[in-house]
Structures are given as C-alpha cells and as structure tokens.
C-alpha cells in the first residue's frame, strides 16, 4: 500500500467513525460536575476512573470529560485496552465523535502483530491506524523501525502497512537499513527505501537511488536497486610488513557498481547478486589469508554467487562477467609468483574463487609483460600460474579456426596452434600443433616449447619457405628441432620432402637465422613451376662463412 492509500484509509476511518457511540463512564471514585468559563458542562473525575466505548476500555487516575462534545482528557497510569491491543501513555485525549485518540508522553501501543513507541500518537482505533511522531520505534515481523515519524494502517492480513520518515533505521537479525523515507506495503510484503538508502548485511554495504526489499514468509527473498547500484564489502587479510617484521592484519574494501542490481536470498542470507549496465567489480584475492593482489573486472552484466564458509558466513564463491568483459589483475608488491599487471578481455569471463581458476570465452585477449595471447577459450589456473588456451571449451567443436590460440612474444613472430600452455611465473610454455615464422621460413611442429628467452624446441617439426605451411610444396622434416632466435636452427635428423615425397636425409642440419648477419648453414631453396621446367626447386645449397662479416 502506498502513502496516498495509507492517508486515504486514515481519512475514511475518521468519516465513518463519526456516527459511532460515545464514551460511557463506568466508574470513578469522585465525580464532580462543573461549568467552565464558556458555560459548558465538564465532568471532573478522580480515582479508579474507567470509561468504555464499544470494545475499548480506558482507565486512569484522573480526567475530565465534556459529554456534549464527546471530548475527554485522561492522565495518571492511563491505559486503553481493546481486545488484545493495549495503549499506555502519560496522558490521552479522546474525541468520541471522530473516534480519534491522541496519546502524549511515553506512548506505548502493543498489538498481537506489532508494537509501537513514540512521544506522540494520533490513533484511529476503529481503523487500527495512526500517526506516531517523536523518537518512534515500530516493531513488526522481526523488524525494529526507528524514525521521526511513522504513519501506519493495519491490513486485512493483520500486518501493518506504514510510511516511516526522518532518519529511518530498520533493524533485522541479518541486516541494518537506513534511509530518509521508507514505504512498506503489508499486502505485497515489499518495502521501498528512498532518500539515500543503505543496507548493511554480512559486512556488505549496499546503496543506490532506491532499494526495494521483497519478503517471503517474513524472510527477505529479493533486494533490488533500480539505479546507481553500489556495493562495498569489507574483508581482512594478512600483508607482509617491512623486512624482518611479521605479517600485518589489514582491511580491504571490495567494490561493485552497476546501473541496476538484483540480489536473491535464501533464508534471509545472500545467495546471488546480479549487476547490470556498466557493471564493475574490484575484488581482492587471498591465499591462506595472505593478500595476493586485486582484480578489477567490468562488463554489461556481472553475477556473483555466494556460499557459506566454515563459520556459516556467506562469501563470494564465483564471479561471472558477460558482455564486453574486460579486466586487470594487479599483483601485490610482495607477490612472488606473478610480478606484473595482467590485462585481459573476452565476451564472457568466469572466476571460481575456491578453485582459484578463471575461464575466458570468445574473442579472448590477454596481455602480460611482453607477451600477448589471442584465443577463443582460455583457462587460467592461478595456484599453478598456468594459462591453457584452446579454440573452444573442452568437448565443443571448433567453429572458427581463427579462434585457435595465437601467442606473441616481443621480438618474435606470432605462434598459432591447436592448444597452448603458458607459465606466468617463469615464462615457459608449449604449443600443440603450432606454426610460426622466422625470417623467410615457416615452422610447424606437433609440439613447440620454449626453454629460454631465445630458444624454441620443436617435436616432429617441419621447416619450409613455402607459404603453404599446412600443405607445403616442399619442406624439411625433423623429429627434433632447436631454434635459437636470430642465430640458427638445428635439426636432427632431417629429411627433404617434395610434395610429401622424401628425397634425401641427413643426420643433422643447421639453418642460419641471422636477421641480416652472415652465418654458416643450409641455404633454403625456392619452389617454382613453368611450362618448360615443370615443378622445380632452385637455390638449395650450403653457405660457409669464416666470420659474420664475410661478404658484408
């Protein structure tokens, strides 16, 4: 029920009550009839005063009553009882004609479904509604609402709809909410928090333009922030002190934002959170409670799943980023395994916190130090500091060959293969069924591994200057190749193939790769075809240089 409906109900209650019966005196130890200065009759009553109207009974120590106007004032242990409802206050003023009771001082209204305390209460007894002002405390369904003013009306389901304003605080077992104004509809069981609303639960602080709370069976089931959603989450972890010092327990603030937020709860505890529209997260990573670094991610939609830990406290279990996902991982300065920032992007990114793994899918790009990885699918194992890249997730057929992993290191030609494994700590990696280029030649191997900054090892590889690398006109084949960048290539044994047919072999061979320098080794031929000669190889030979400056 909205505010207008609440106020309308209060107005209707006043109108319909005007035809009701008046207060009737039941008892008073002393009754004195007097005429006031305006010539109106007034009853002064003292000692065990008791009045009744319908099901309502008022008792007090003293009071006065204007019978003609139906107005009475009562003080001294004042109490009004109606069925299971009890109202107490320092003093009470009644208007029988309008069925309005005004309570002053230490007001306390207790009902079977709710309780209320305030300094002032305008109470419509027949409609079971009212307006409480001054240090209001309203208790209902496990909630304690404090505010400067509360307007309420009891609904057909016995719960009360209300509007609370002025420094509102809502206390529940699992959470605390604050705002300038809140409206609760008891029939739909939905609260709207307005004017700088904030909800704090399990160390998380949620805020936005508005916060909507939907309850089911007296438990919060869904929290919605329709605009400018923001979450701040306090966490603790150990950081390394200065040299020789012990680790220090420090506080970290995870941060999440989005245009819209939806949080789903089970038994009142967070189960999942979905951020939509320019969503971002800042999440701090720990290993054995020791801070490792921070991860910043953004995308169209970010979904967080929560799970209870050993202490039953809910913590983030996984993060899923969809739609233009991108992020940055910044390792702590004390981290030993990864020393530099990792930049990455993909169509979707999924983090598993307990498994310490990340999965990136479709149009994946990862930049780390002097290396670049482009692929259709990448799995990062943070505990082992490994990246595993393939064109598509396991068990899914490759739809686009261009999604096969392509790995580039500074100073080297790109390498593409069916799969890639790369160690972020030591820079070593391997490519299955990989291809790459060095100078004028192309290399392909069942497995290509790097063992130093300038060394590649190739198993069951081929080398050719033909640009048809997948099906070359000619090539040299070898079980093992060792490529030393900008120096030479060593192969053993080596066989020359023409059109897939072996021509001759050697125990080993050395090919120069000097980027313009002179070096002894085989000179690769070129392939050609014409009407006079047919298919041919031209230029195969061996060059011996006494030193690198010969013929320069």
Regions found by a protein language model. Name each.
Residues 1-23:
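Bacterial Sec-dependent N-terminal signal peptides
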Residues 18-552:
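Structural signature for solvent-exposed beta-strand/loop edge elements and short helix-capping sites
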């Amino acid at each position: 029920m909205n505010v207008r409906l609440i106020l309308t109900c209060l107005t209707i209650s006043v109108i319909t009550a005007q035809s009701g019966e008046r207060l009737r005196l039941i008892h008073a130890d002393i009754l004195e009839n007097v005429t006031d200065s305006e010539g109106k009759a007034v009853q002064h009553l003292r000692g065990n005063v008791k009045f009744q109207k319908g099901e309502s009974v008022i008792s007090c120590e003293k009071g006065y009553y204007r019978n003609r106007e139906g107005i009475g004032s009562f003080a001294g242990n004042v109490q009004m009882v109606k069925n299971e409802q009890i109202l107490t206050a320092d003093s009470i003023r009644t208007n029988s004609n309008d069925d309005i009771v005004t309570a002053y001082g230490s007001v306390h209204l207790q009902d079977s479904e709710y309780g209320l305390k305030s300094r002032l209460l305008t109470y419509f007894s027949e409609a079971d509604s009212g307006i409480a002002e001054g240090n209001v405390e309203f208790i209902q369904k496990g909630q304690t609402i404090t505010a400067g003013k509360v307007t309420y009306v009891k609904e057909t389901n016995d719960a009360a709809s209300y509007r609370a304003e002025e420094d509102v605080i809502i206390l529940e077992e699992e959470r605390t909410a604050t705002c300038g104004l809140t409206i609760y509809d008891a029939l739909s069981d939905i609260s709207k928090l307005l004017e700088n609303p904030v909800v704090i639960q399990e160390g998380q602080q949620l805020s936005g333009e508005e916060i909507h709370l939907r309850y089911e069976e007296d438990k919060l089931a869904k929290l919605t922030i329709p605009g400018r959603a923001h979450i701040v989450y306090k966490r603790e972890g150990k950081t390394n002190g200065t040299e020789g010092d012990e680790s220090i327990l420090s506080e970290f603030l995870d941060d999440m934002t989005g245009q819209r937020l939806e949080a789903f709860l089970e038994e009142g505890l967070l189960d999942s959170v979905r951020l939509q529209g320019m969503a971002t997260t800042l999440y701090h990573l720990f290993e054995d409670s020791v801070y490792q670094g921070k991860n910043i991610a953004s995308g169209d939609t970010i979904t967080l799943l929560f799970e209870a830990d050993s202490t039953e406290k809910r913590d983030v279990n996984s993060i899923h980023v969809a739609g233009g996902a991108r992020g940055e991982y910044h390792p702590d300065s004390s981290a030993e395994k990864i020393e530099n920032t990792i930049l990455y992007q993909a169509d979707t990114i999924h983090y598993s916190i307990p498994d310490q793994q990340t999965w990136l899918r479709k149009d994946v790009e990862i930049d780390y130090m002097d290396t670049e990885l482009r692929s259709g699918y990448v799995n990062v194992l943070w505990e082992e500091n490994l990246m595993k890249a393939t064109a598509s997730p396991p068990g899914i057929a490759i739809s686009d060959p261009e999604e096969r992993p392509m790995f580039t290191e500074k100073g080297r030609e790109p390498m593409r293969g069916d799969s890639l494994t790369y160690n972020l700590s030591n820079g070593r990696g391997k490519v299955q069924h990989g291809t790459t280029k060095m100078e004028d030649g192309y290399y392909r191997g069942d497995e290509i591994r790097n063992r130093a900054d300038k060394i590649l090892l190739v198993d069951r590889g081929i080398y050719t200057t033909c640009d048809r690398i997948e099906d070359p006109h000619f090539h040299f084949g070898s079980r093992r190749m060792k490529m030393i960048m900008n120096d030479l290539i060593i192969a053993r044994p080596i066989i020359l193939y023409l059109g897939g047919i072996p021509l001759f072999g050697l125990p080993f061979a050395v090919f120069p790769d000097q980027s313009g320098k002179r070096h002894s080794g085989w000179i690769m031929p070129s392939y050609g075809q014409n009407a006079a000669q047919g298919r041919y190889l031209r230029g195969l030979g061996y060059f011996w240089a006494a030193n690198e400056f010969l013929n320069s």
